Amino acid sequence: SFLDKVKKNLPYYIKTKFVIQIPWYRYYFEKFIYKKRGSLLMKDFTFNKISFNKVQQLTNQSKVILDIHNPWQNGLTQRPFDALGNGKALITTNASIMEESFYDEEIIQVVNRDIPTIDTEIFKIDINIIDGFEEYSLENWSKKIFKLINNYD
């Protein structure tokens, strides 16, 4: 599986914890019918919705967030915004992030889904909010909405 490849390509001293939320029937179907999921065990998955507080707790405990997007999806998922907004580095399979104004290759790594090679320097850097990311803040979004409403005559 992709996560097995990620774990294999990381040095032993980098601790990983994967939290994967999928429906239970999908796990069983992929694990036993398609023989996917590699060495990942049932304990690596959660089959219940993860609360906002739990997501925030896991994000706070993390140095880097891994985003594995659906290859048929267009655009970004919420995870890049959550990661970067919380001052975390990001590793993603979604190359469309490179087109965003806030893209910074020092704190955002785009990896190949088939051969995920990760530059471990990403685990050593400390980040704050990055240039261009302010555009996606709640405050800026609110200003845009009210400007649209006021200009809607």
Residue ranges, per PLM feature:
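Short, structured coil segments at secondary-structure junctions
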Residues: 86, 104-106
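Conserved donor-binding/catalytic loop of nucleotide-activated donor transferases
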Residues: 60-62, 84-87
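Nucleotide-sugar donor-binding catalytic core of glycosyltransferases
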Residues: 1-77, 92-103, 140-152
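A charged, aromatic-enriched C-terminal amphipathic alpha-helix characteristic of glycosyltransferases
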Residues: 115-153
